[in-house]
A protein has these predicted regions:
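Bacterial N-terminal signal peptides
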Residues: 8-19
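Positively charged n-region of N-terminal signal peptides that target proteins for export
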Residues: 1-5
């Protein structure tokens, strides 16, 4: 072969090799349930046991819908506006079958098996959890690897490892590390300053799904309640809530439940934080989320704390009444909730922290579907507030 022909053949081979997809490699991930799971990656066919984890996939992969073969309907049920925004951005979602109506008891193992995923990513919440032994056994018996992630039950511990797991599964380790560095820098700014200043923590009432039920459903140090301590507050619920039945894997301090109005009035908290979302729109509760106007959220919040018992609390009398998007309890960018709460709890210490700017950077650098709406609100519009 002539040298010129040899060079031409070599160049052609290099082009073909560069265009060829990367071969799958066998990897082992250590999931948040403490299990070592071996599978081929990057995965091409994903089952999401909880639909809201699409947001986490979208942080890392440019076309997350192209990877989905089955998912749960919880995003559509809990935040239809967010669901519609993702459908508009990723039209392939309309072709992906739901295998659950958005609750663990409606999860169809048969439909999951029929979807033939490379991996089932489960996370509890509105889908099968690490306590769903029967579901896990059936999936694994059929040769489907099961990997657990978590942004809900213990977000402060599990957010970073969960994103690292997803990065490995998707072959997007570099992107995952970029997000983790961004996330950690925002969390460290809060925790480092609190550790140095050691301010007295205000007593905080977190009223979950505010306005939906009688006062007051409240988390302990689990789910969205986990952010109170790290933001420099004291959650009055952790002093009385006991371990719920059927949750042996959780510590007592991780409990959640109902606080009596009498207890709340006796504790007379310094700060009131209600959680809300679009799921409360038809229920007369606090509405926050994508596309929501801040005036609407502020009006809802005022109605909630005007109810007998709440209206006389110190937090209401002194204007320390706030609302936050409940879905922060199930997304990787929960650092926004921590920044906002830290500013509410210690406004002088964190007067230079700008959650609005943090959200703008998150939108520009990482989110393919920008968060635009009202995700936190105050009766006094001067503290941290989002409503663009």
């Amino acid at each position: 072969m002539k040298p010129s022909s040899l060079i031409g053949a070599l160049i052609a081979w290099l082009f073909v090799a560069a265009a060829a997809p990367a071969a799958a490699a066998t990897i082992t991930v250590h999931d948040i349930a403490g299990r070592d799971v071996t599978l081929e990656a990057p995965v091409k066919r994903i089952l999401l046991g909880e639909g809201r984890q699409l947001v986490a996939l979208a942080l890392l992969h440019p076309h997350p819908a192209s990877l989905l073969v089955a998912w749960s309907a919880d995003m559509r049920r809990q935040d239809e506006r967010l669901y519609d925004l993702y459908r508009a951005k990723f039209p392939l979602l309309d072709r992906v079958p739901f295998i659950s109506r958005g609750s663990p008891d409606t999860f169809s193992v048969e439909q999951a098996l029929a979807a033939a995923p490379d991996v089932a990513i489960l996370s509890g919440g509105y889908g099968p959890s690490r306590r769903s032994d029967d579901v896990v056994h059936k999936l694994e018996a059929a040769g489907i690897p099961v990997v657990f992630i978590d942004f809900v039950e213990d977000p402060l511990t599990n957010t970073v490892p969960s994103m690292r797991i997803l990065g490995r599964l998707l072959g997007e380790e570099a992107r995952a590390e970029q997000f983790i560095a961004f996330y950690q820098s925002h969390m460290d700014r809060i925790t480092t300053r609190l550790a140095a200043a050691k301010p007295a923590p205000p007593n905080v009432l977190m009223h979950a799904h505010a306005g939906h039920m009688e006062c007051c459903n409240s988390p302990g140090r689990v789910t969205i309640g986990a952010f109170i301590d790290i933001a420099g507050g004291h959650n009055i619920a952790v002093d009385v809530l006991k371990q719920p039945a059927g949750r042996p894997s959780l510590d007592e301090t991780m409990a959640r439940g109902q606080l009596s109005l009498e207890y709340v009035m006796a504790r007379d908290p310094d700060v009131y934080v209600g959680t809300g979302g679009l799921h409360l729109q038809a229920l007369g509760g606090l509405v926050l989320g994508p596309g929501v106007d801040p005036a609407t959220s502020r009006e809802d919040l005022a109605k909630v704390v005007s109810k007998p018992g709440l209206d006389g609390l110190r937090a209401v009398r002194t204007g320390r009444v706030h609302g936050i998007w409940h879905l922060f309890n199930n997304v990787p960018f929960n650092f926004l909730a921590v920044e906002v709460m830290a500013k509410w709890f210690h406004p002088d210490l964190f007067k230079d922290v700008d959650p609005d700017e943090s959200l703008r950077e998150l939108n520009s650098r990482f989110l393919p579907v920008p968060l635009v709406g009202t995700f936190w609100i105050s009766l006094d519009p001067k503290p941290a507030e989002r409503g663009r």
